[in-house]
Amino acid sequence: MTGSFTGTWTALVVSLRVLPFAARVWILAGTAALVVALALLAPPVLQDEGYHDFAPTALFGVPDFGIVASNGAFLVVGVWGLWRIGFRRIAPWPFRSPGEHWPYLIFFLGVVLVALGSTYYHAGYHAGYRAGPSSETLLWDRLAMTVVFMALLAAFIGDRIHLGVGVAVALPLLLGLGALSMAAWHVTGDLRLYHLLQALPILLILMICLLFPDGLTRFKYAAWMAFWFGLATFCDLFDDTVYGWIGFGGHAIKHVLAAIACFMILAMLEDAGRRTETTPAPGPSP
């Protein structure tokens, strides 16, 4: 069974990658355009103010301790990634071109900002200096999340499609689009663009892995990342249900699962370093 699946999967990937480069780019762009069109046709998504009422995560007698402390998972992964890449601690250094590592640095910086933004959103009430979680403070949490998703998409574009396009063009444009999604929410109250910028990058990253040859990135890590992000989203959407199952709120668990998803990218880069050691001059796989 496993051998049959592997053979079918390999045949699918090969059949896609033998298409002309322009055709593969059009497949990717067409998919993105279709998803964007469907999002625009959907009704506006407004922020439910009840969203801020999270299931209990009390620990050590402190209300909502878990939902705040779980942001430490983001902080650990983000700082670890910044240290490993920013100080070139991945050895051998897997990046072959100047600037190739910048999307990953911004990705892990975004993860740190998520830890800070989410803590600010959740913890202020318990520190006694504001009225509690609100859409106004949630904006900073979500803005940081757009940095994470946009930088990651730019990294995969740069690795598998074109380095210059990924780093010099896609990265600033996508980061700007993420900021625009928050401005749109602030002005119109509509969250469609924000939700689109969470879901679409994951879909496009998986498609990029199928359509274009391997570089530093690997499909298995992207798939695991998507899995953990998907599980995190489930726990967030069914916060109270998860609490009913295990006596602990799903939103706090979401933080930990999403941090694991981010760690998959660091694991992928560490693996790329090991491959660089065993193969001094790697090239894209056929």
Which residues does each predicted region cover?
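Early transmembrane hairpin module of multi-pass membrane proteins
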Residues: F5-L171, L175-D190, L216-E277
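Extracellular-loop-to-transmembrane junctions of the mid-late helices
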Residues: S181-I208
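Hydrophobic secondary-structure block in the mid-to-C-terminal portion of proteins
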Residues: L210-F212
